[in-house]
Amino acid sequence: MRVGIIGCSGRMGTLLSSLLRSSNRFTLGPGFSRQSPYSLDSVIESNDVLVDFSSSSFSEELLIALLSNPKPLIFATTKPEPSYSVDEKLQRLAAYVPVVVCPNTSLGAYVQKRLVGLLARVFDDRYDIRISEVHHREKKDPVSGTAKELASILCHTKQEAWQQEYSIGSRCHSVKNIELHVSRVGNISGEHEVAFISDKEHISIHHKVFSRAVFAEGALRILDWLIDESPPPGCYGPEVGLKVSM
């Protein structure tokens, strides 16, 4: 399988390129970045599958090109805000090829999301909720895709389990608030914590990445799944691509 990386000259693109070069299952094809000598259309044409590690500002352009020449896609980028246009194009592309939407390809990050969903069902509104995320100072996203996913899981679960409406930064009395704290400091690869805090106790689920290699390894795991399972067209989540059963 020939793999093309969108955002090939970035930190994640460079790490995944190194893993692919040492793999006996995959061939590293031409990648795309603003500095690469290849056009986006030629990169799509030359590869069997694409991994997007670029940026949210490029998502629309990439998906428009892919809709003209559909190829399987691992979408490992934070969606832009608002995301409805990108979501619509991802769904259209998924009618033709398998699309794995996984803004955070770390196995630990996926497990954290599942645990957060479980705790949101257990703890009622006597527990305040706080999401904290820390990344390196060069990260462009004002809020990480993982933090957005965690907030979405909390809001959905609270509505489903408790019939309570939650949102980030709510100042409305009828909508309960999820506090969000974002830091961009140093060279931190990624850190996310979700805390449930009452007057009497505090429980938190904390995931910290020590090396960005974990994201590249997660992407490789999803590529393995694409080869092993040959899934039909459709939109898949990280639990399928990362081969996790919980």
UniProtKB/Swiss-Prot annotation:
GO biological process, one term: lysine biosynthetic process via diaminopimelate
Active site: 135, 139
EC number of this enzyme: 1.17.1.8
Broadest EC class assigned to this enzyme: oxidoreductase
Reactions the enzyme catalyzes: (S)-2,3,4,5-tetrahydrodipicolinate + NAD(+) + H2O = (2S,4S)-4-hydroxy-2,3,4,5-tetrahydrodipicolinate + NADH + H(+); (S)-2,3,4,5-tetrahydrodipicolinate + NADP(+) + H2O = (2S,4S)-4-hydroxy-2,3,4,5-tetrahydrodipicolinate + NADPH + H(+)
Binding-site residues for NADP(+), renumbered to this chain: 34
Domain of life, per lineage: Bacteria
UniProt main location, coarse: cytoplasm
GO molecular function, one term: 4-hydroxy-tetrahydrodipicolinate reductase
Keywords: Amino-acid biosynthesis, Cytoplasm, Diaminopimelate biosynthesis, Lysine biosynthesis, NAD, NADP, Oxidoreductase
Pathway: Amino-acid biosynthesis; L-lysine biosynthesis via DAP pathway; (S)-tetrahydrodipicolinate from L-aspartate: step 4/4
Cross-referenced PROSITE patterns: DAPB
Residues reported in the UniProt entry to bind NAD(+): 7-12, 76-78, 102-105
GO CC terms: cytosol
Location in the cell: Cytoplasm
Residues annotated to bind (S)-2,3,4,5-tetrahydrodipicolinate: 136, 145-146
General function of this protein: Catalyzes the conversion of 4-hydroxy-tetrahydrodipicolinate (HTPA) to tetrahydrodipicolinate.
Family (UniProt): Belongs to the DapB family.
Name of the protein: 4-hydroxy-tetrahydrodipicolinate reductase
Organism: Chlamydia abortus (strain DSM 27085 / S26/3)
